[in-house]
């Protein structure tokens, strides 16, 4: 029963539809019994949904993926770990969009507060796309919480949109790994030095 209504029709692509509909006292509706429209059964999809993801609604498929995020200060190994794990598990990984954005739009090595919001939004869009390409796991380098921490570190405030995205990120990931700053510092031109790395790492740890 659905509310005050009974079951009126039973839809399937299987011969057992006749027996089920009789048991339910409803009309049997056979759909695509020869599987010309969808040449696959639900039981086959269930055995390996990642192999047959083209038959699964994107909203459903995203929930089948374990999204694992790596956070930490710059030069803590997030990118290396995410990429290597993706290769090991034959899946994709989500690079830190902020790095790409910074290299393209920074002025005197700085970004404005609204640009940090754009980074968080752009990262999320790309991450959702990667979820649909992933095989069982998605390994994600950085999230909106870290972008929020950058905003607070450089500007002492974050736009409302970034605050909202950071809050949503608290419950978005299945696993969160904090990478440590106990490895040698890679002093590239886009970073703020080893001393700042340690300071920023303590802020991230405190926030967690």
Where are the model-predicted features located?
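Hydrophobic positions on the alpha1 helix immediately C-terminal to the Walker A/P-loop
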Residues: 81, 85
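Nucleotidyltransferase catalytic core that binds NTPs
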Residues: 1-67
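The conserved Walker
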Residues: 74
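Conserved lysine of the Walker
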Residues: 78
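Conserved substrate/cofactor phosphate-moiety recognition/catalytic segment
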Residues: 87-129
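Glycine-rich phosphate-binding loop used to anchor ATP phosphates in small-molecule kinases
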Residues: 120-170, 186
